[in-house]
Amino acid sequence: MDNNETEPRILLVEDDKADREKTLEALRKYGLGYEVRVVTGGHEALDYLLGRGRFHERSRNPLPDLILLDMSLAPIDGARVLARIRDNESLKAIPVIILCSTPEERGRAMVESVRAHAYAVKPVSADDMRDLVRLTYPSVTSYAAMRFE
């Protein structure tokens, strides 16, 4: 996060509209002061993170402080997106919470295999989302209203 900014940025990468709305609703419930950007696919996520195409203006499309990443994206899945993130020097330190539909036991193994910070089984409750974000990005202390773009 830039020193001039006070609002932590979250990038939500989710292609399913219903899951996207449920995740946004979970984030909104506590109004924890995040700026949430949404992209709907793996290619779009990489374009955003790498500042390509319509996301080329970094001042308008700043890097996130935290990424919420759906694992079942198509045509490029979340594991491949995360591998690209981890292989990029300017992106690899960004914490990533993977969002998956798999049972809890498989989710834990998936976190290790794809080098994520945490995982959540969809749909994610507001309480679980709050706890995951705070655990993964502990410097978030603001309780200001959220801004969605």
Q: How does the language model describe each region?
A:
Residues 69-71:
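Active-site residues of response regulator receiver
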Residues 99-100:
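Hydrophobic/aromatic residues positioned on beta-strands within the core alpha/beta folds
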